Amino acid sequence: RWMSAWAKRSSDWGQNLLALGDFNIDRKDDLLWQACTSTGLSVPADLETVPRTIFSNPSKPSLDKFYDQIAWFSSTTTGLPRLSLEYIRGGGFDFMPYIYKDTTLTKSSISFRMSDHYPLWAEFALA
C-alpha cells in the first residue's frame, strides 16, 4: 500500500520508481508475472532474454527461473508517473567463469556457497 500511494504522488521530487529484486517469478507469463505486470510495471524487452540463474537454460532463458527483475511504470493508463529516465540497455552478469575458474563443484553445490542468481543491471542516460 505504501509503495502504491508513494508512486501516485507525482508532485514529489523522487518520482522515478524502479522495482528491483527477487520476485520469485518462475517464468514469464506465470501468475506472479501477471500479478506484477498488471500493476503497470514493465520489464524492458532486452532483459526478458537474460538468463537469471546458473540453472537457466542459456538457449531459452525467458522460459524459466525468471526470478529477478528490474521494472518500472511505463504506461500512462495506470495513473502512475512514468519513468522520466531514458533507458539505454540492460543485461546480466555471468560470474561463474570469474569466481569458479578451476573447480569440479556441481551447480547445486555452488548454489549453497554463493547466490545462484546472476546480477542484473540497467543503464540510463544522464539527464
Positions of PLM-derived features:
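Metal-dependent phosphoester/phosphodiester hydrolase catalytic core
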Residues: 1
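Metal-dependent phosphoester-hydrolase catalytic domains
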Residues: 4-18, 24-127
